[in-house]
C-alpha cells in the first residue's frame, strides 16, 4: 500500500475540497489519462485496486504512471468510545482529489485498450472520471 515513509506531523485536520485542480491536470508522460471530474478522497487501497485492474488488462503492453499519492492521514476512534479524550489514531491515508486532476497515465497501448483498462479502473474508484488523450483539449 502507498503511504508516506515519514511525516512531519502524525495527524492532520479534516480540511475541505473546494475548487478545481490546476496543478496535475495535464498529461505529463503518457498518451492517455484518467481524469477525475468530481472531488473526493482516494484511499491507498482504492489506488492500488485500480492500478492492478489496469496492469492486469494491458499485461506487459504498456507503461503506467500513478499521478496521485495518499499523503493525508485519516484518524478514527475505536468503537464504543466516549467523545473527547483527544483525536483518534491514524487508520489509513488518502489522496485528496479535485475535479480535473489526472489520476493515472498510460502509454504504449492502442485507443481501445486504454479505454477498456481505464473503464475497469474507474469502477474501483469513488470519484467520477473521464478518459483524456494527448493532443485533445482537456
UniProtKB/Swiss-Prot annotation:
Keyword ATP-binding attached: no
Which example biological process does GO assign this protein? Answer: translation
User: Which Gene Ontology cellular component terms are annotated?
Assistant: cytosolic large ribosomal subunit
Keyword terms: Ribonucleoprotein, Ribosomal protein, RNA-binding, rRNA-binding, tRNA-binding
What GO molecular function terms would the record report? rRNA binding; structural constituent of ribosome; tRNA binding
Q: Which InterPro entries match?
A: Ribosomal_uL16, Ribosomal_uL16_bact-type, Ribosomal_uL16_CS, Ribosomal_uL16_dom, Ribosomal_uL16_sf
**Pfam families annotated for this entry?**
Ribosomal_L16
- Write out the function statement from the record: Binds 23S rRNA and is also seen to make contacts with the A and possibly P site tRNAs.
Family, as annotated: Belongs to the universal ribosomal protein uL16 family.
- Known partners and oligomeric status: Part of the 50S ribosomal subunit.
Name of the protein in question: Large ribosomal subunit protein uL16
Q: Which organism is it from?
A: Anaeromyxobacter dehalogenans (strain 2CP-C)
Which gene is this protein's source?
Answer: rplP
